[in-house]
Amino acid sequence: MSTHNTKEEFEQAMQKCRELFVKKLHDYGVAWRIMRPETMTDQLYIKAARIRSLQIKGCSKIDEGIVPEFIGIVNYSIIALIQLELGVANTEDISNDKATELYDAQAKKALELMLMKNHDYDEAWRCLLYTS
Protein backbone atom coordinates (compact mmCIF):
# COMPACT_ATOMS: atom_id res chain seq x y z
CA MET A 1 0.00 0.00 0.00
CA SER A 2 1.39 3.39 -0.94
CA THR A 3 1.52 6.20 1.54
CA HIS A 4 -0.16 9.48 0.87
CA ASN A 5 0.22 12.85 2.46
CA THR A 6 -3.46 13.69 2.22
CA LYS A 7 -3.12 17.07 3.93
CA GLU A 8 -0.40 18.14 1.50
CA GLU A 9 -2.36 16.85 -1.51
CA PHE A 10 -5.45 18.72 -0.32
CA GLU A 11 -3.49 21.93 0.15
CA GLN A 12 -1.95 21.65 -3.34
CA ALA A 13 -5.34 21.10 -4.95
CA MET A 14 -6.88 23.92 -2.93
CA GLN A 15 -4.10 26.27 -4.00
CA LYS A 16 -5.11 25.76 -7.65
CA CYS A 17 -8.76 26.33 -6.76
CA ARG A 18 -7.92 29.43 -4.73
CA GLU A 19 -5.79 30.90 -7.52
CA LEU A 20 -8.74 30.69 -9.91
CA PHE A 21 -11.13 32.07 -7.26
CA VAL A 22 -8.87 35.11 -6.72
CA LYS A 23 -8.47 35.61 -10.48
CA LYS A 24 -12.25 35.55 -10.96
CA LEU A 25 -12.64 37.98 -8.03
CA HIS A 26 -10.29 40.35 -9.83
CA ASP A 27 -12.30 40.01 -13.06
CA TYR A 28 -15.87 39.95 -11.70
CA GLY A 29 -15.73 41.00 -8.07
CA VAL A 30 -18.20 39.37 -5.70
CA ALA A 31 -21.07 39.34 -8.20
CA TRP A 32 -21.97 35.90 -6.81
CA ARG A 33 -23.21 37.54 -3.60
CA ILE A 34 -26.65 37.96 -5.22
CA MET A 35 -26.94 34.24 -6.00
CA ARG A 36 -29.57 32.30 -4.08
CA PRO A 37 -28.92 28.73 -2.84
CA GLU A 38 -30.91 27.34 -5.79
CA THR A 39 -28.61 29.16 -8.20
CA MET A 40 -25.59 27.64 -6.50
CA THR A 41 -26.99 24.11 -6.73
CA ASP A 42 -27.75 24.72 -10.42
CA GLN A 43 -24.13 25.74 -10.99
CA LEU A 44 -22.92 22.60 -9.21
CA TYR A 45 -25.29 20.48 -11.29
CA ILE A 46 -23.99 22.02 -14.52
CA LYS A 47 -20.39 21.23 -13.55
CA ALA A 48 -21.26 17.65 -12.53
CA ALA A 49 -23.25 17.13 -15.75
CA ARG A 50 -20.31 18.37 -17.85
CA ILE A 51 -17.92 16.00 -16.04
CA ARG A 52 -20.27 13.10 -16.67
CA SER A 53 -20.66 14.08 -20.32
CA LEU A 54 -16.89 14.28 -20.81
CA GLN A 55 -16.44 10.87 -19.18
CA ILE A 56 -19.15 9.20 -21.26
CA LYS A 57 -18.27 10.79 -24.61
CA GLY A 58 -14.53 10.71 -24.11
CA CYS A 59 -14.14 13.94 -26.08
CA SER A 60 -15.50 17.46 -26.28
CA LYS A 61 -15.82 20.27 -28.81
CA ILE A 62 -14.46 22.74 -26.27
CA ASP A 63 -11.08 21.36 -25.24
CA GLU A 64 -10.83 22.58 -21.66
CA GLY A 65 -10.47 19.20 -20.03
CA ILE A 66 -12.08 17.82 -16.92
CA VAL A 67 -9.86 19.39 -14.22
CA PRO A 68 -11.38 22.88 -14.58
CA GLU A 69 -14.80 21.36 -13.96
CA PHE A 70 -13.63 19.81 -10.68
CA ILE A 71 -12.07 23.15 -9.71
CA GLY A 72 -15.41 24.77 -10.49
CA ILE A 73 -17.21 22.32 -8.21
CA VAL A 74 -14.82 23.12 -5.36
CA ASN A 75 -15.15 26.87 -5.85
CA TYR A 76 -18.93 26.89 -6.27
CA SER A 77 -19.21 24.70 -3.17
CA ILE A 78 -17.15 27.12 -1.12
CA ILE A 79 -19.12 30.07 -2.48
CA ALA A 80 -22.34 28.25 -1.53
CA LEU A 81 -21.06 27.74 2.01
CA ILE A 82 -20.18 31.43 2.23
CA GLN A 83 -23.63 32.34 0.95
CA LEU A 84 -25.30 30.06 3.50
CA GLU A 85 -23.24 31.65 6.26
CA LEU A 86 -23.78 35.29 5.23
CA GLY A 87 -27.16 35.04 3.54
CA VAL A 88 -27.92 36.36 0.08
CA ALA A 89 -27.16 40.02 -0.60
CA ASN A 90 -28.83 42.41 -3.01
CA THR A 91 -25.52 44.06 -3.84
CA GLU A 92 -21.83 43.28 -3.79
CA ASP A 93 -21.58 43.93 -0.07
CA ILE A 94 -18.12 42.57 0.74
CA SER A 95 -14.66 43.35 -0.55
CA ASN A 96 -12.54 40.96 -2.57
CA ASP A 97 -10.20 40.68 0.42
CA LYS A 98 -13.09 39.74 2.71
CA ALA A 99 -14.32 37.19 0.14
CA THR A 100 -10.85 35.64 0.02
CA GLU A 101 -10.72 35.53 3.83
CA LEU A 102 -14.11 33.76 3.91
CA TYR A 103 -12.94 31.38 1.16
CA ASP A 104 -9.85 30.48 3.16
CA ALA A 105 -11.93 29.89 6.30
CA GLN A 106 -14.26 27.48 4.47
CA ALA A 107 -11.31 25.67 2.87
CA LYS A 108 -9.75 25.28 6.33
CA LYS A 109 -13.01 23.83 7.70
CA ALA A 110 -13.16 21.40 4.77
CA LEU A 111 -9.59 20.25 5.41
CA GLU A 112 -10.26 19.74 9.11
CA LEU A 113 -13.42 17.76 8.40
CA MET A 114 -11.67 15.63 5.76
CA LEU A 115 -8.84 14.79 8.15
CA MET A 116 -11.30 13.75 10.86
CA LYS A 117 -13.29 11.64 8.39
CA ASN A 118 -10.08 10.05 7.09
CA HIS A 119 -9.22 9.02 10.61
CA ASP A 120 -12.57 7.26 10.97
CA TYR A 121 -12.79 5.79 7.46
CA ASP A 122 -9.08 5.11 6.77
CA GLU A 123 -9.21 7.02 3.48
CA ALA A 124 -11.64 4.52 1.95
CA TRP A 125 -12.53 7.18 -0.62
CA ARG A 126 -9.20 6.54 -2.34
CA CYS A 127 -10.56 3.15 -3.47
CA LEU A 128 -13.54 4.73 -5.25
CA LEU A 129 -13.59 5.31 -8.98
CA TYR A 130 -13.62 9.00 -9.81
CA THR A 131 -16.21 8.19 -12.47
CA SER A 132 -18.73 7.09 -9.86
Predicted feature locations:
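Extended low-complexity intrinsically disordered regions
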Residues: 1-40, 98-126
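Charged/polar positions within long, soluble alpha-helices
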Residues: 49, 53-56, 78-86, 112-115, ...
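Short, structured motif recognition centered on aromatic/hydrophobic residues
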Residues: 44, 70-81
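A cross-kingdom feature marking solvent-exposed beta-strand/loop segments within repeated
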Residues: 53-68
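Charged interaction scaffolds used for protein-protein
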Residues: 91-94
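Amphipathic, well-ordered alpha-helical segments in soluble domains
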Residues: 40-50, 76, 106
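An alpha-helix initiation/capping motif
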Residues: 34, 38, 64-71
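Conserved small/polar residues in nucleotide/adenosyl-binding loops
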Residues: 130-131
